[in-house]
Amino acid sequence: MSDTVVSLTASPAAIRHDWTLAEIQAIHDMPLLDLVHRAGVVHRAHNDPADIQRAALLSIKTGGCPEDCAYCPQSAHHKGANLPRERLMPVDAVLKEAAAAKANGAHRFCMGAAWRKPKDGPDFDAVLEMVRGVRGLGMEACVTLGMLTQSQAQRLAEAGLTSYNHNLDTGPEFYGDIISTRTYDDRLQTLEHVRQAGIGVCCGGIVGMGERVRDRAEMLLVLANHAPHPESVPINALVAVEGTPLEDRPPIDPLDLVRMCATARIVMPKARVRLSAGRKSLTREAQILCFLAGANSIFYGERLLTTANNEADADAELLRDIGVPVPEVTLAAAE
């Protein structure tokens, strides 16, 4: 084992914002059992291991996005994905879904709109009303709307938004292979607007798009050296959708997700590490290994924007089996 890793495993990780790429790669590449143990030690030093957040995710405006993200069926550039373009959902319909999610045990309600950036006007005003409504239900509220101005971020903060999702997707070197219509700096600027408004940052990425391990480490480096760390870090496995440029990418090894969850936990000890898209392909045992490695949030519900997710009953059973208290489901879906 390298001296770098030995020094990192001597005691639970402190909160740092000065990580190097070499350190993060060394952590990621540790023998798996050592890595999971190390991440578990850090996780238990900073978090309650029985506290696994359940977040629900709803697409409030689907399809027709002008961005060309290679993984996304919502892009207007990927005609073969055959995803219809829809208008923004009515506020009352969204809040009905939020109430159902809460009854199913969700703590947070996340809303995603397929926009490059929201325009000020009726649609943005409606999103603000959705945020206020979700907060009124006693839930955390998160939205992902694309790039934001500082003024828009401030208005979302005033509406009570808990967190804003704006993923980096991958490391800066590989980024240009995945998207050309928005720069890495564009993404970082939106994250800065969100921070300046006092909103929690939800930011992570996707593995399995053809990137190198170095690219994954570079993404974590960017996130871990932001101060403060993101409030939550979604770790997604690519869901290869027919009609997108990445439709033929093979599934990743589940242990790659375990390594990403563990590394994210070690370098960002207090962040919510969210096991996100692609979880449906994991066995119960692989998911439990991710929890041991420090994942402490999941998307709860049978769809994630446009892709399938685990059934709520199966998730509830899994969480109960590992000792996480989950209320009995009282409402399976919005009527």
From Swiss-Prot:
Q: Any note on cofactor binding?
A: Binds 1 [4Fe-4S] cluster. The cluster is coordinated with 3 cysteines and an exchangeable S-adenosyl-L-methionine. Binds 1 [2Fe-2S] cluster. The cluster is coordinated with 3 cysteines and 1 arginine.
Residues bound to [2Fe-2S] cluster are 110, 142, 202, 274
Q: How does it assemble?
A: Homodimer.
Similarity comment: family membership: Belongs to the radical SAM superfamily. Biotin synthase family.
Could you identify this protein by its name?
A: Biotin synthase
So what does this thing catalyse?
(4R,5S)-dethiobiotin + (sulfur carrier)-SH + 2 reduced [2Fe-2S]-[ferredoxin] + 2 S-adenosyl-L-methionine = (sulfur carrier)-H + biotin + 2 5'-deoxyadenosine + 2 L-methionine + 2 oxidized [2Fe-2S]-[ferredoxin]
Relate the protein's function as given in its record.
Answer: Catalyzes the conversion of dethiobiotin (DTB) to biotin by the insertion of a sulfur atom into dethiobiotin via a radical-based mechanism.
Kindly give the InterPro entries that the UniProt entry links to this protein.
Aldolase_TIM (IPR013785), BATS_dom (IPR010722), Biotin_synth/BioAB (IPR002684), Biotin_synthase (IPR024177), Elp3/MiaA/NifB-like_rSAM (IPR006638), rSAM (IPR007197)
Kindly list the positions annotated as binding [4Fe-4S] cluster.
65, 69, 72
Instruction: Write down the EC number.
Output: 2.8.1.6
Domain Radical SAM core stretches: 50-279
Arranged from A to Z, the UniProt key words for this protein are:
2Fe-2S, 4Fe-4S, Biotin biosynthesis, Iron, Iron-sulfur, Metal-binding, S-adenosyl-L-methionine, Transferase
**Could you tell me the Gene Ontology terms of the biological process aspect for this record?**
biotin biosynthetic process
Q: Which residues form the signal peptide?
A: none
As recorded in UniProt, coiled-coil segments are: none
The protein's matches in SMART domains, at most eight in alphabetical order, are given as: BATS (SM00876), Elp3 (SM00729)
Keyword Metal-binding: yes or no? yes
Q: Could you tell me which pathway this protein works in?
A: Cofactor biosynthesis; biotin biosynthesis; biotin from 7,8-diaminononanoate: step 2/2
Q: Which domain of life is it from?
A: Bacteria
- Molecular functions per Gene Ontology: 2 iron, 2 sulfur cluster binding; 4 iron, 4 sulfur cluster binding; biotin synthase activity; iron ion binding
- The species is Methylorubrum extorquens (strain PA1) (Methylobacterium extorquens)
Cofactor(s) for this UniProt protein: [4Fe-4S] cluster; [2Fe-2S] cluster
